[in-house]
From Swiss-Prot:
Keywords: Endoplasmic reticulum, Lipid biosynthesis, Lipid metabolism, Membrane, Steroid biosynthesis, Steroid metabolism, Sterol biosynthesis, Sterol metabolism, Transmembrane, Transmembrane helix. It comes from Gibberella zeae (strain ATCC MYA-4620 / CBS 123657 / FGSC 9075 / NRRL 31084 / PH-1). Sterol 24-C-methyltransferase; part of the third module of ergosterol biosynthesis pathway that includes the late steps of the pathway. The third module or late pathway involves the ergosterol synthesis itself through consecutive reactions that mainly occur in the endoplasmic reticulum (ER) membrane. This is Ergosterol biosynthetic protein 28. It is found in: Endoplasmic reticulum membrane. GO terms for biological process: sterol biosynthetic process. It is a multi-pass membrane protein. In Fusarium, the biosynthesis pathway of the sterol precursors leading to the prevalent sterol ergosterol differs from yeast. The ringsystem of lanosterol in S.cerevisiae is firstly demethylised in three enzymatic steps leading to the intermediate zymosterol and secondly a methyl group is added to zymosterol by the sterol 24-C-methyltransferase to form fecosterol. In Fusarium, lanosterol is firstly transmethylated by the sterol 24-C-methyltransferase leading to the intermediate eburicol and secondly demethylated in three steps to form fecosterol. The chain crosses the membrane at residues 7-27, 116-136, 141-161. Its main location: endoplasmic reticulum.
């Protein structure tokens, strides 16, 4: 453990270590998003079919450009998920950017704006997962979805409670 000490955040308390651990996990998540869709498809497991109510393509209308071109159909045998290689890479990139912000914040929790930026990463993550579950229906709730919700929720509750302990400069 002494060999790791120079690399660990100096701030007192558990929050910086929590953020470092989540960042390390996020690096792995980002890498897997670039190499396989398997794990992301377990999270984004909603099933969809083409929207039969959309009109056919015309000179003025392109069904492929519509955000509602697919509709939820969890029990339809023809239904597929929406995860594509592009979506996987975008999610991997977003996760890596979030990881960088949280990792930087773990070492700089004493700076108010940095603390706030880290907090916003959890707000965005929670909002994303909640909207995918409740609005866009790209996931159903189960064990793979539990962890993103639990980690983001924990941070959203915990960080405001301990802000004054860490932040020295607003």
């Amino acid at each position: 453990m002494d060999a790791l000490k120079p690399f660990l955040p100096e701030a007192k308390g558990v929050l910086p270590y929590y953020m470092i651990i989540l960042s390390i996990i996020s690096i792995g998540n980002s890498l897997q998003a670039y190499t396989t869709l398997h794990f992301s498809r377990r999270v984004y497991n909603g099933r969809f079919i083409r929207n039969p109510k959309l009109p056919s393509k015309t000179n003025n209308f392109e069904p492929e450009d519509q955000t509602n071109k697919l509709i939820p159909a969890q029990n339809d045998p023809k239904a597929t998920d929406q995860l594509t290689p592009l979506a996987g890479r975008l999610f991997g990139t977003w996760t890596l950017i979030t990881c960088i912000v949280r990792c930087y914040a773990a070492y700089n929790l004493h700076i108010g704006p940095v603390y706030t930026l880290a907090y916003w990463t959890y707000i965005v993550a929670f909002s994303h997962f909640a909207s995918e579950l409740f609005v866009f229906k790209t996931m159903t709730f189960g064990l793979p979805q539990y962890f993103p919700f639990a980690l983001a929720s924990t941070s959203l509750i915990w960080m405001p409670l301990v802000r004054d302990h860490y932040v020295q400069y607003n």
